[in-house]
A protein has these predicted regions:
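Short, solvent-exposed loop/beta-turn-alpha elements that line the ligand-binding surface or hinge
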Residues: 77, 150, 231-233, 303-312
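Conserved C-terminal helix/tail region of periplasmic/extracytoplasmic solute-binding proteins
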Residues: 318-350
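C-terminal motif of bacterial Sec signal peptides marking the signal peptidase cleavage site
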Residues: 14-17
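Short, glycine-/small- and polar/acidic-enriched structural segments
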Residues: 27-29, 33-35, 39-179, 186-189, ...
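Secondary-structure end/capping motifs
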Residues: 249-331
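Pocket-lining segment of extracytoplasmic ligand-binding domains
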Residues: 111, 142, 193-285
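Bacterial signal peptide processing site
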Residues: 19-21
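Single conserved hydrophobic/aromatic residue that forms the stacking wall/gate
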Residues: 1-12
Length: 350
């Protein structure tokens, strides 16, 4: 691996994995706040903050609304002292939620479907959907202005782990274009956080990359984005927030306050420029410059990545099950109400 390409991988891993593990004590607020404190201020005293541990599947600009809610102080104003931990994989996030190590998980909702089908007595329920498109891109070694999905037939592609949303959405797109996944040599042995290193090391003719990996590869002339999985797959419930049913019953006020803060983050990214959003979340991605963050946000905004609200609709859930079924990863189709609630997201809009 050349020094330059090695730097690409190091930068990618730092940007995807080095999230803050706690919220700064003082964060300036520049937007209107919802009155949603968990424990209101009394007699002019500072409100008591509720500690909440959130385990995220990865640390990526793809999840900008959440980081805006942190950096603009929305969680703190909602009465929440947020401890953000990066789990590096949906399976690890789910393990943290089930064990009680995390109060809330942020991951692909397919993981909650798997858990429900295993017959969990304390199911993990999705209560807020953040992204409505896939956040990854197909990267080739050379520029391809006239790329067609059929170009992948017979080629080596670094995909993602079997059963994960990146891999399943990729296979879904292939099938939508009349291509059987077996016609493509898909490497499912590499974790999505390591595909960039494998690609720069010479593996694969193509790789499926999240941001900032895709942009970093382009900046170093090591790869070129030829297709957006988010655009070509259509609207997909890619990532959502979830918690154990028992936690939600015990702390409905915390879940509501958390959702209210997230909704403010959603409204921010949908009403501000890429430059303004980049400036807001810069400290979450200190290993990269604001210009690069802006480029990535503009790419995500252009493809309508973020919802206007956090409501996880039944239509979206049905599409998720269809994708899982198409990938051969669904034993049975759980009922919508068993793994999704829209109560908190709908109230956050009021």
């Amino acid at each position: 691996m050349s020094r330059g390409l090695g730097d690409v991988y190091k930068r990618q891993m730092l940007l995807m994995g080095c999230g803050q593990t706690s919220v700064p004590d003082e964060i300036a607020d520049s937007s209107e706040k919802k009155e949603s404190s968990v424990e209101p201020e009394k007699n002019g005293e500072e409100p008591v903050l509720q500690k909440v541990t959130l385990n995220e599947v990865a640390h990526s600009i793809f999840y900008a609304p959440m980081y805006v809610a942190i950096e603009e102080g929305y969680f703190k104003d909602a009465g929440i002292d947020l401890d953000l931990v990066t789990g590096f994989g949906a399976d690890k996030v789910m393990t943290a939620v089930l064990s009680g190590e995390a109060d809330i998980g942020f991951m692909g909702p397919e993981t909650t479907v798997y858990t429900a089908n295993e017959g969990s007595k304390d199911p993990v329920i999705n209560f807020a959907q953040l992204t409505q498109r896939a956040g990854n891109f197909l990267v080739a070694r050379e520029e391809m202005n006239d790329f067609k999905w059929s170009d992948l037939i017979g080629e080596d592609v670094l995909g993602g782990r079997a059963g994960g949303m990146p891999e399943m959405v990729f296979e879904y797109i292939l099938k939508q274009n009349g291509i059987e996944p077996s016609e493509v040599n898909i490497d499912q042995s590499i974790d999505f956080g390591s595909t960039g290193a494998a690609f720069t090391g010479g593996q694969g003719a193509y790789t499926v990359e999240f941001e900032p990996g895709a942009t970093l590869l382009e900046q170093e002339k090591a790869g070129y984005v030829v297709a957006s999985l988010g655009v070509d797959s259509g609207y997909v419930p890619y990532t959502a927030f979830s918690a154990k049913q028992s936690y939600m019953k015990k702390h409905p006020d915390v879940i509501q306050a958390f959702t209210n803060a997230l909704q403010q983050g959603m409204e921010y990214v949908n009403t501000h420029t890429p430059e303004e959003i980049a400036a807001s979340i810069q400290t979450q991605f200190s290993e990269t410059d604001t210009a690069t963050i802006t480029t990535i946000i503009r790419r995500y905004q252009k493809q309508d990545t973020w919802k206007r609200d956090l409501v996880f609709s039944e239509d979206s859930f049905t599409l998720l099950l269809d994708i899982l079924e198409s990938a051969g990863q669904l034993e049975k189709r759980p009922d919508y109400q068993d793994v999704v609630t829209t109560e908190y997201a709908e109230k956050a809009l009021q």
